[in-house]
C-alpha cells in the first residue's frame, strides 16, 4: 500500500511542480480506526495566480481514483466501465478553503451517497502490478466496514 500511495504522491508532485516551488512533507500515517491511511502533504508556492478550475483539473482524479496515466482516453474508458457496472462515475473530489490569499486543498477519496432511504458507500482499491488480489479484497472489506461502524449499521 505504500507503493500505491507513492504513485499518487509522486503524480501530484509532478503535476503541481509546474505551478511553482513545491515541498513534499514526510509521509504520515493517519489512524482511522480499523483503517490505516497514508498522508503526504505537498505545499506549492504558486508562480502566478491560478484558477480554481486549473487546480482541480490537476488534482482530480488522482491515481487513487482514476487511471494512470491519466489521459482523456483512459478517463473515458474508466467512465464507460463504471457506467456499465452501475458504479458512481466519481466517488471523490478535491475540497478546499480559500482565505486571505492562501488555499488549503485536500483530495477526498471516500463517499457516502443518500437517495431517499437508500445509502450507498462506494469504495475501490488501487491495483498496480505488485497488487495481491487477497489484499485488495481485504482493503475493500475494511473500508466498507469502517463506514458501516461509523453509522452503527
Which positions does each model-derived feature cover?
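Contiguous alpha-helical scaffold segments within structured protein domains
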Residues: 1-81, 152
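Glycine-rich, small/acidic residue-mixed loop/short-helix segments
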Residues: 70-153
Amino acid at each position: 500500500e505504500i507503493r500505491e500511495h507513492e504513485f499518487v504522491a509522486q503524480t501530484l508532485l509532478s503535476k503541481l511542480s509546474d505551478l511553482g516551488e513545491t515541498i513534499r512533507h514526510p509521509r504520515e500515517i493517519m489512524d482511522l480506526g480499523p483503517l490505516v491511511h497514508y498522508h503526504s502533504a505537498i505545499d506549492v508556492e504558486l508562480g502566478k495566480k491560478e484558477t480554481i478550475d486549473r487546480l482541480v483539473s490537476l488534482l482530480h482524479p488522482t491515481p487513487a481514483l482514476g487511471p494512470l496515466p491519466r489521459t482523456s482516453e483512459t478517463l473515458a474508458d474508466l467512465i464507460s466501465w463504471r457506467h456499465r457496472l452501475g458504479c458512481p462515475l466519481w466517488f471523490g473530489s478535491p475540497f478546499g478553503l480559500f482565505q486571505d490569499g492562501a488555499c488549503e486543498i485536500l483530495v477526498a477519496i471516500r463517499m457516502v451517497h443518500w437517495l431517499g432511504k437508500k445509502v450507498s458507500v462506494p469504495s475501490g482499491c488501487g491495483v498496480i502490478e505488485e497488487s495481491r488480489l487477497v489484499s485488495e479484497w481485504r482493503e475493500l472489506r475494511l473500508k466498507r466496514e469502517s463506514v458501516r461502524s461509523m453509522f452503527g449499521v
